[in-house]
Amino acid sequence: MNSPNPSPIGPRRRQAPANRLGRARFTLIRSGLMLGILSWTMPICTAGAQEKAIVPTEVIALFNGRDLSPFVVWLPATGGHADPDRVFSVVDNIDGAPAIRSSGQHFGGLISRQSFRDYRLVVEYRWGLITWKPRMDRARDNGILLHCQGEPGNAGRKFDSPWMRSVEFQIIEGGTGDIILVGGFERATGDLIPAVLTLMVQPGQKYWDPTGVPTKFTKGRINWQYRDPAWTDTLGVRGPRDVEKPTGEWNRIEAVCKGGDVTYFVNGTKVIEGTNGSLKEGRILLQSEGAEIFLRRVELQPLN
């Protein structure tokens, strides 16, 4: 998440080595299409009410392999709960299996209809080839917002932001595994409610360091442990200690959420940890943020 409220206007396709991307044939699923459109464009409650969160006792598949019915779309650029440009769709064959496609054309997300707490989120993703203005030549960017609370769009005072109050699992070339704390406004009072989290960092630094000093953060990005200090916001950027796989390969990320604590893993490597968070439950938002991405597994596992 780098740009607050963009106006993407056009795509660019890039080729990648065949040994990385392979044959990515995919077609849109048509069975049950009207049911899918009706179910995932209907708005969730916008009064800011938070229903009782579900604690998984068995695996909950947020992507069922067929449609997007567990989610509601949020795209401020196209009116909120409408998706005329099919930013989000299901493809039935990407590397041999169905997946969610997030085109990246407009900033926004798929918001889960239900709230959750105390879980292990497991997601498998890979980047596509398409990038969009204003991030056409910048690092491929995406993310997953955890513990989303309040109204969609409440990260902006006018409730027209792509994002909402949450703790983000950042997915970006060179920075996958960062934590971003996103505050959100309350409509009734106009107050900005921050997302608060304590992380171990060295004094004056914003890189997670398990040997550091506990520091309370209320906004912004805290970098994963080995993010390259020389990182630049350029397409295809990679750091010498990145654990995200090269573009076109599948990655597995995990977010372990217990109470106000969060721990992130990228391809089996622990990259960051936060404790004593003010957000302990909420919806889950899958972002669209200027770069095509595919998600073939999105599931919540019980902690025990």
What would you call each of these model-derived segments?
Residues 13, 23, 27-30, 56, ...:
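Hydrophobic alpha-helical context, especially transmembrane and signal-peptide helices
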Residues 29-43:
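Bacterial N-terminal signal peptides
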Residues 1-27:
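N-terminal secretory signal peptides that target proteins for export/translocation
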Residues 47-304:
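Carbohydrate-interacting regions of secretory-pathway proteins
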Residues 8, 12, 43-44, 57, ...:
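Generic alpha-helical structural signal
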